[in-house]
Amino acid sequence: MRFRSPCTIFVVVKICIVDIVITYVDGLDPVWQKDYERYTNQPVLEKRFRDWGTLPYLFRGIAVNMPFIRKVHLVVSHYSQVPAWINRDEVNIVLHRDIIPEEFLPTFNSTAIEMFLHRIADLDEEFLYFNDDMYPMLECRAEDFFRDGKGVIGMSSHFWPSNMYKIHCRNSYRAACHGVGRKPGLCFLRPQHICSPMLKSKCEELYDRLREQIHASITRVRSNGNLNQYLYLDYIYLEGKIVNKRQPKKHFSLGVASAKSLCQFIMHPTHQLACINDVQLGEERFVELKKTILYAFNQRFPQKSKFEV
């Protein structure tokens, strides 16, 4: 009699590992305020660095809706900037001095910080960069942000930079074109304003190519000559490593959004992601909106996450 050898079948499952990087400023921190006023000779701008108290809900949204995340890195200027509720066993605290050359410190310019995020120790190849006004509201999958080694985000073309932010976008696109040896045209790219899917190796590659140009663009506070995070995202796109697909997100400007519409969306979201953008507000409206937003977020995400003590 003949006996067939047992056949063993191996199924290879690719596990997508993604990190998140969050930059954060606590404008009420006396240590930070002292540095800001000393190095800029300007009073702290209330709107620019105002704390809405919503950071815990960003972390809760990650815990509930993004279970595929390997590690969260929180980038701050000093340890005094780290909220007391942060669980440091679950959140990697990254100080500016850990990634930014000493010659550019201290910095109060988010675009300067964005030039060096790829230098975070133990950062995964695929990482999402979140501003602290962006929130995952519904269940997300890793494939929503990365597919077959490519980032997924919407890219649009623009002709005229109507404000400083768009000037930074144009600067960044032109520099990215230089990085791939391409002459930029009249238009410039602007990625969708949501969490950015970055590839660490491509960021390192471009930084090595354009180190002098990047360093020359850096200022302590924002100026028209700055580059921003889209330098890297545009380069990744030009290298053929972006799937041009818009993320399902809702954008609110606090200057025009009503308390009712904010509350309704946060408690019953219709999009995976949300950006709630701060603008100059009077004290009365700030207090009203903050109360509404915190109430709604606490209804949406009532349970503490592993990122909190």
Language model feature labels by segment:
Residues 80-81, 116-160:
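GT-A fold catalytic core of metal-dependent nucleotide-sugar glycosyltransferases
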Residues 63-66, 118-121, 236:
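N-terminal cationic-hydrophobic initiation segments that often serve targeting/anchoring roles
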Residues 152-223:
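Long, charge-rich alpha-helical interaction segments
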Residues 81-122:
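Active-site-proximal specificity loops/subdomain of glycosyltransferases
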Residues 59, 105-109, 147, 151-168, ...:
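Aromatic-rich, lipid-facing transmembrane alpha helices and their immediate juxtamembrane interface loops
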Residues 6-98, 240-241, 269, 273-309:
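N-terminal anchoring/stem segment of glycosyltransferases
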Residues 211-309:
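C-terminal catalytic/acceptor-binding lobe
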Residues 50-54, 108-112, 224-228:
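Soluble or luminal CAZymes and related metallo-dependent hydrolases
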